[in-house]
Curated annotation (Swiss-Prot):
It comes from the Bacteria. It comes from Shigella boydii serotype 18 (strain CDC 3083-94 / BS512). Disulfide bonds: none annotated. Binds 1 [4Fe-4S] cluster per subunit. This is Quinolinate synthase. InterPro entries: NadA, NadA_sf, Quinolinate_synth_A_type1.
Length: 347
């Protein structure tokens, strides 16, 4: 029997916070990026969790702001020869797997993800080997090497539907790496799921007691929760879903005040969707506790204006994403299954 890697004992060294830019410096880099995007025939693909000024720039230049599933779709279909991926490393890898003919640039190749870090490929392969009768489903937040071992890749926006489908076929599942999302999906579908025990450092920090106190302070507020959060937080929610699903819920819920339990980067697009509603951050630290991420992924914060300009200007090994071709071809199989399945859901 394999010994499972224990993410709870792993130490994830946080990157240094980017040096703040002055107003003039921000204006300089914004104009430089706009010029370089045109010169490089490039387009920005940014995740909801990047800083607001990055999302705004993606909007202004005809790029994409979305969850990881739509980032993958957009980048593959866009005619630009270069994709500037503002996010974390697995997103850049996914873009390269789906668009091998394109140049994939990232502001930094050191933008990690705690879910990815918490699922080392050697330990995961041993875990899968110990359960050969199970279908392997991995979250998009994993390395290309882990995706190679998967039968399916999935994002949070279609996780419940996919596992419900596989369960209807009588398949038993290995789910990796997020234990909270896996538990949520199991509860929603009743599927036979064996979970890897990873967690997102942002969502894992939401505190039940502190959220209860905030709810008591604002009893008229609805609570929106990403399913990467602990079960006790999910149980308090008026709406549970992926980033795009939470934005949709913000529009449909009648409440004028919303408590949001996910990375605060989502507030940029959510506030656009509901300009007349008040958005409150769910607390990440209770009494006597401190937060590490404080509701914002430290690696997402590495996607600054200066780093984006340098990526477009310098290209090369410090910014370009490469995936071994044999690895890419194998990882493409479960990714394409995900995209094909998602297309059937859209009808």
């Amino acid at each position: 029997m394999s010994v499972m890697f224990d993410p709870d004992t792993a130490i994830y060294p946080f990157p240094p916070k980017p040096t703040p830019l002055s107003i003039d410096e921000k204006a300089y880099y914004r104009e430089k990026i706009k010029r370089l995007l045109k010169e490089r025939n490039a387009v920005m693909v940014a995740h909801y969790y990047t800083d607001p000024e990055i999302q705004q720039l993606a909007e202004e230049t005809g790029g994409c702001i979305s969850d990881s599933l739509e980032m993958a779709r957009f980048g593959a279909k866009h005619p630009a020869s270069t994709l500037l991926v503002a996010g974390v490393r697995f997103m850049g890898e996914t873009a390269k797997i789906l668009s091998p003919e394109k140049t994939i640039l990232m502001p930094t190749l050191q933008a990690e993800c705690s879910l990815d870090l918490g699922c080392p490929v050697e330990e995961f392969n041993a875990f899968c080997d110990a359960h050969p009768d199970r279908t392997v489903v991995v979250y998009a937040n994993t390395s290309a090497a882990v995706k190679v071992r998967a039968d399916w890749v999935v994002t949070s926006s279609i996780a419940v539907e996919l596992i419900d489908h596989l369960d209807s076929l009588g398949e038993k599942i290995i789910w990796a790496p997020d234990k909270h999302l896996g538990r949520y999906v199991q509860k929603q579908t009743g599927g036979d799921i064996l979970c890897w025990q990873g967690a997102c450092i942002v969502h894992d920090e939401f505190k039940t007691q502190a959220l209860t106190r905030l709810q008591e302070e604002y009893p008229d507020a609805a609570i929106l929760v990403h399913p990467e959060s602990p079960q006790a937080i999910v149980d308090m929610a008026d709406a549970v879903g992926s980033t795009s699903q939470l934005i949709a819920a913000a529009k449909t819920l009648p409440h004028q005040r919303l408590i949001v339990a996910t990375d605060r980067g989502i507030f940029y697009k959510m506030q656009q969707a509901v300009p007349d509603k008040e958005l409150l951050e769910a607390p990440t630290a209770g009494e006597g506790a401190t937060c590490r991420s404080c509701a914002h992924c430290p690696w997402m914060a590495m996607n600054g204006l200066q780093a984006i300009a340098e990526a477009l200007e310098q290209e090369g090994s410090n910014h370009e994403v490469h995936v071994d071709e044999r690895l890419r071809e194998r990882a493409l199989v479960p990714l394409n299954r995900m995209l094909d399945f998602a297309a059937t859901l859209r009808g």
